[in-house]
């Protein structure tokens, strides 16, 4: 809808399948740890001790930090990631507005170096790869707030004029790894924790703004008796009418009648 209104967004690595949902080949991220790691490897050269997974049977090389990106060899993976670093830096340094959508607090952590893998899935796991060095846990308020603060610190050093818009995803969990809570309770915990984090983060910085997409989808529209879920998506993703309602509110808040940013 931004493009339909005459706006553009940064598109690096347009050839790369992992850039379909982002301005560079970051793939989708589901937690603030994965977000923070993007900024740290882009600007600070940080790298996990176990950079690649090798599937035991197929030999496919998997990037566990960018969802499910697969290669035929380590050399191919390393070359692609080196190119990605250039594009990632260029995208973040040139951005005028950065939108961060907070999703989950459930994470899978490498016990060796505390890096967070994006998803415990893909050929490596399916083919019997060793997941013993990774542990599941629920991240908490202070950790998530610190992740956003570190992102702000890095952006302030490399692109201080950039504004950051924070939202919370209205897409709830459809499954949980927790043994102490059902999926509805786990989802409520994730969203309420991240909503509180977003509120505190926004209050600390003049260039950080909160946009209430979560509240519009999960509270306001149900109060009006309007459905928010797309048919055939297990009451999981929001429907097109909800998306349009949210985007109209977004334009009303941030864009004037001449399509100029407010």
Predicted segments — roles?
Residues 1-262:
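Extracellular glycan-modifying ectodomains
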């Amino acid at each position: 809808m931004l493009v339909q209104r005459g706006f553009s967004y940064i598109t690096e690595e347009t050839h790369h399948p992992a850039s379909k949902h982002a301005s560079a080949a970051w793939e989708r991220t589901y937690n603030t740890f994965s977000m923070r790691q993007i900024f740290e490897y882009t600007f600070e050269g940080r790298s996990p001790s176990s950079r690649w997974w090798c599937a035991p049977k197929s030999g496919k090389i998997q990037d566990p930090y960018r969802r499910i990106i697969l290669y035929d060899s380590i050399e191919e993976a390393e070359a692609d990631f080196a190119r990605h670093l250039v594009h990632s830096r260029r995208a973040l340094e040139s951005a005028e507005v950065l939108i961060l959508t907070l999703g989950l607090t459930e994470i899978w952590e490498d016990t060796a170096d505390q890096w967070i893998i994006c998803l415990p899935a893909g050929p490596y796991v399916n083919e019997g790869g060793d997941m013993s060095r990774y542990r599941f846990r629920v991240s908490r308020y202070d950790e998530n707030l610190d992740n956003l603060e570190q992102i702000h610190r890095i952006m302030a050093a490399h692109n201080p004029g950039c504004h950051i818009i924070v939202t919370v995803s209205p897409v709830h969990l459809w499954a949980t790894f927790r043994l102490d809570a059902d999926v509805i309770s786990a989802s409520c915990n994730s969203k309420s924790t991240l909503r509180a984090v977003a509120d505190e983060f926004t209050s600390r910085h003049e260039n950080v703004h909160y946009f209430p997409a979560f509240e519009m989808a999960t509270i306001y529209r149900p109060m009006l008796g309007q459905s928010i879920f797309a048919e055939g998506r297990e009451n999981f993703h929001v429907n097109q009418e909800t998306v349009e309602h949210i985007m109209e509110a977004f334009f009303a808040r941030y864009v004037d009648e001449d399509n100029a940013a407010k």
